[in-house]
Amino acid sequence: MADETMSVDDLDLPEKARRFFAEQWGIERLHPPQKQSIEPIFTGKSALIAIPTASGKSLIAYMGILRKLLLEDVGSKAVYIVPLKALATEKYEELTQLGKALNLTIGLGIGDATSEAKKINQCDILVCTSEKLDSLIRNRSETMSNVSIIVADEFHLLNDASRGPTLEINLTKLRYLKPNAQIIALSATVGNCNELAKWLDAELIISDWRPVALEYSTYHDLHLEPRLVQSSARSSEPGNLKPPRDLVGPKSHPTWVALEDTLDSQGQLLIFVGTRKSAESEALKLSKRVQKKLSKENPEKLDLFSNVVASIEGGRQSAMADKLIECLKGGTAFHHAGLTHNQRKIIEEAFKSGIISCLTATPTLAAGVNLPARRVLVRDIKRWDDGMSRPLPVMEIRQMLGRAGRPKYDDFGEAWVLCKGTDGW
């Protein structure tokens, strides 16, 4: 049956690896789509895995890499391609934990630092952006001579006008240079999955299974209208929807009303906005309102934020750090590609631990960086592009909404879309 789980102990992996997943990462069973994906991958087939956000795609790739490097083709090399530097760093850190336990070296290729060069040549697993990989293939093709397995994360971006061409050229070149290399493509569900799988000569694994049920709602003039429930097994009938409700607060600031409602239910809110500037200004406005609310209702909580503020103050000072500090005084923060690595790590840890109650972010965060919240609000469904305000692609909105619901912590996630004026709702 496609919906069965599988014990990690039953996997054809070295015992050390199985023990690491169970003891260090607390993973004892595979979700149904993971089990479904592992079967072709462990027989050496290429695969396109198209399953929802936060369903554990990366784990499938890690297991495929370990089987290839430790059992099938010992001494060979893996390449893990990602679209963003922030995502490359996250995957590098996760794989480094694995590498230490299993005696594998991990390299990171995201820029031109001379310190990267040696590790890129000598590593067993190279995590890199498409742009860096393009440079390596052009200038140091010998780096690819021993590659036996290639992972393309966020593979649906092949359809993206700005990032797609580089990824397509890289994969075409790698398939020419290494025709026998196994390819694992990790994708959100897109309309042309069958075509993409055929192009890769890969088996297609497609599923809408989620580890946490998800309720999609529209949010307009403070009126919340649940539209669809996607359960952890399948989409349920509309009869399972919660009744509509009206939130109370200033109509001029619907994001604050959503956050106050979240705070009152001891939750966390992730707000997606269109630009870095919007992320910063929204976080600052919300911080001031949170400070005002907590100073009346729970002043002790304000003290919790001081440790995070101190961590940012202890780093290199900049205008960005000053803005972050102002936001953190009220337990909010912003997250975008303009943050330093250290600032990003501090913010992510504070959000994961529950200290920060609200994070504003650009869609970059939806592309793989693992920061789920019980409630997600997509504030901006349009983007200024080529001199016009254009609607975001449906897939991009789905990626953002898919960050709602924390596996292991929440029974369900709440995915809200803010509708302004006549946004067609």
Please report, for each region that a protein language model flagged, where it lies by residue:
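Conserved interdomain linker/interface between the two RecA-like ATPase lobes of SF2 helicase motors
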Residues: T172, Q182-K285, A333, A337, ...
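Inter-Walker segment of RecA-like/P-loop motor cores
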Residues: T89, T96-R138, W209-V212, Y216-Y219
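Conserved SF1/SF2 helicase motif Ia
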Residues: L66-K91, L177-N180
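Conserved segment of the helicase C-terminal RecA-like domain
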Residues: A181, L371, R375-W425
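Walker A/P-loop NTP-binding motif
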Residues: E39-A47, K57-D73, E94-T96, T172-R175
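SF2 helicase catalytic motif II
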Residues: L126, S130-D134, N139-I183
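Conserved C-terminal RecA-like helicase domain
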Residues: Y80, T96-G107, R276-C358, R390-I397
